[in-house]
Regions:
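Active-site donor/metal-binding and catalytic loop motifs
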Residues: 184-205
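A short, conserved alpha-helix in the catalytic core of glycosyltransferases
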Residues: 140, 145-146, 151-152, 156, ...
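Short, flexible, basic/aromatic active-site loop/helix in glycosyltransferases
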Residues: 116-143
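Short beta-strand-to-loop acidic/aromatic patch adjacent to the donor-nucleotide binding site
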Residues: 79-90
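Glycine-rich, basic loop-to-helix element that forms the pyrophosphate-binding segment
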Residues: 60-76
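Acidic donor-binding segment of Leloir-type glycosyltransferases
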Residues: 25-58
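Short, well-formed alpha-helical segments that are part of the catalytic scaffolds
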Residues: 14-27
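Conserved donor NDP-sugar-binding/catalytic core segment of glycosyltransferases
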Residues: 94-126
Length: 223
């Protein structure tokens, strides 16, 4: 049986997508605690009262997804594998159970994501970069649906000098370069991504400036 998985879901305004994702998670036996992190008080107040196994927390509006992820880690704890999911992702049956099994069975994998393409894979694929909106089989780790193994979750926090971008790149390089683990796309677990619904319909203020600043900081840190 797969190890239990805690789940962190940042959200702002895609309540339909969030409800669909929660429905997917409700039938996955590996899922333990789910934390919904609301981007601002208005979002928090709009969310329905949580059911069993679901908690909701709030961060000041616009502080960035890295602070949202860290707030979620604080809420669910660091004792289990942690999945970080966007609210515009749909998971196929037992997706997180499959990812958890992969982490349990291969101690060299530090971070893993489902196959998010329409291309069938016969084996897990090691990756050295991130998805980058490439859904044709050439993309890497999916920041919109990634799971960090428990022993790394115990010591990792997202870099809050970044705001909205490059967090998946940052954790990928930490896992592979700093800690010496592998990053993998799992061939048996699958998901579908609606490609940044919130960014397209309700983007952060100063979108271009924030992207540029995150890019400059990330490159100075790693490249």
């Amino acid at each position: 049986m797969a190890s239990r998985v805690n789940v962190v879901i940042p959200t702002k305004s895609n309540f339909t997508g969030l409800a669909e994702l929660l429905s997917d998670l409700s039938v996955d036996p590996a899922v333990d605690t789910i934390c919904i992190v609301a981007d601002g008080q208005n979002t928090y107040d709009t969310l329905p009262d949580p059911s069993d196994g679901i908690i909701k927390v709030v961060v000041p509006e616009g502080v960035g997804i890295h602070k949202m992820w860290n707030r979620g880690i604080e809420a669910v704890g660091r004792e289990s594998h942690i999945a970080f999911l966007n609210d515009d992702v749909r998971l196929e049956q037992h997706c997180l159970s499959s990812l958890s099994d992969s982490l349990d069975n291969d101690p060299t994998i530090g971070i893993i994501c489902p196959n998010y393409t329409s291309i069938d894979m016969n084996e897990d694929r090691r990756v050295l970069n991130t998805c980058g909106s490439r859904y044709d089989g050439t993309g890497g780790l999916a920041g919109f649906a990634m799971m960090l193994r428990s022993d790394l979750a115990k010591v990792y926090s997202f870099d809050e000098k970044l705001t909205w971008w490059y967090g998946d790149d940052d954790v990928l390089l930490w896992v592979t370069k700093t800690m010496g683990f592998r990053a993998v796309i799992a061939h048996q677990a699958r998901c579908q991504h609606a490609d940044s619904v919130t960014i397209r319909t309700d983007p952060p203020a100063d979108f271009g400036r924030l992207v540029a600043e995150d890019r400059e900081y990330f490159r100075a840190k790693w490249l």
